[in-house]
Amino acid sequence: MKPSDMRQLKAEDFQKEIDSRKKELMELRFQAAMGNLAQPHRVTQLRREVAQLNTIRGEQRAGEQK
């Protein structure tokens, strides 16, 4: 998901998106530990998306407080 698409999300959808990505990340880490990870680049991609979602959510909260 692109950051421009992330900015279009509603406030309640942010946590759902973050939770789903963290769950997938946990599953991929488990696969990596077992030695059968098919897409190792996906771990980095998910970590980046979670960070972007958290950053955008923080920006929106800061904008609401002003």
UniProtKB/Swiss-Prot annotation:
GO BP annotation list: translation
Ranges annotated as spanning the membrane: none
A GO-annotated cellular component: cytosolic large ribosomal subunit
Keywords assigned by UniProt, alphabetized: Ribonucleoprotein, Ribosomal protein
Gene Ontology MF term list: structural constituent of ribosome
Domain of life: Bacteria
Similarity-based family: Belongs to the universal ribosomal protein uL29 family.
HAMAP family, A to Z: Ribosomal_uL29 (MF_00374)
Protein name: Large ribosomal subunit protein uL29
Originating species: Deinococcus deserti (strain DSM 17065 / CIP 109153 / LMG 22923 / VCD115)
Lineage summary: Bacteria, Thermotogati, Deinococcota, Deinococci, Deinococcales
